[in-house]
């Protein structure tokens, strides 16, 4: 919610978008990141609604490392850490090679086609899923990392993790906001 102070911009609401919008955003995010060769699959977007139809406007996607601070993401921070861990473990275990130079030609080939935006986006997303090994990653996580949520819950519930968060908040927030933010 861009109208809120920095530490309240990432809402705690979930399941507030129609499934079609969620899938559209997934495709856009994967496409942008695959195009640039980034493996941190994030994309900020602004939404406009006209006549009941959503239009999404990706913003700040030239930033391969968006805001990952616990003070910004608060409730969502553990999800981010788990996502990083899953991807890092997958890459290490499968010896995934890092793409050092972008290969944009397949994206440009799609762009040249006489297709609607949605049809092109479907093709971009299919290409992105292949480049980012989405099916292999999901299978790997299902086979080897199903315990990750329990481990993360224990870790983030530990006094050491809570203290680390409190120290970060104390470094950035006024004293009267520290307890409220770290409860």
Language-model features: where?
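Phosphate-binding core of ATP-grasp and ATP-grasp-like enzymes
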Residues: 1-12, 26-41, 47-57, 61-71
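A contiguous binding-surface segment within folded domains or other stable secondary-structure elements
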Residues: 12-20
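C-terminal active-site "lid" helix and adjoining low-complexity regulatory extension at the edge
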Residues: 20, 35, 49-183
